[in-house]
Amino acid sequence: MSIPITNFTQKEFCCKCGCGSCEVSMKLKETLQIIRNYWGKPIIITSSRRCRTHNARVGGVPNSQHLLGTAADITTEGSIQTFYNFIIQLYKSGKIPDLGYIQLYLNKKFIHVDVRYPKSNTVRNLK
């Protein structure tokens, strides 16, 4: 199944250091687009693809899904907790089957989502 990616540009997925690393999984793009379609409001990608240098600079783990282009940190206007709960409901209802992992960073106001395989089946809330 191919979903048109209408609300995100390729540049939004690129490493924030400017190195030009932009390759991300189509499953990640489609998962984010599905979330955006149901949410009906803009979603901001604060981090997606990372090169090893930038990943180390921001404190990412050495085996980060960001290095593989299978993860994104996202936020939106309003309550991040409400947005997180919304994504969980989409997953539970089968709307985003490729979601492999989700973690809420409440104090930092972003949500990490990835499409790792095999799925970790772990949902984490960090405050």
Model-derived regions, located:
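Residue-identity detector for threonine
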Residues: T6-T9, T31, T46, T53, ...
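A short linear-motif detector with a strong N-terminal bias
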Residues: E23-S25, R52-N55, L90-G94
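Extracytoplasmic cell-surface/polysaccharide-interacting catalytic and binding patches
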Residues: M1-Y38, R116-K127
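Extended, low-complexity, intrinsically disordered C-terminal regulatory tails
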Residues: E30-G59
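Generic alpha-helical scaffold signal
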Residues: C22-K29, S48, L68, E77
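Catalytic cores and adjacent binding grooves of peptidoglycan-active enzymes
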Residues: N63, L67-A71, T76-K127
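Flexible, active-site-adjacent loop/turn segments at secondary-structure boundaries
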Residues: T6, R52, A56, N63-Q65
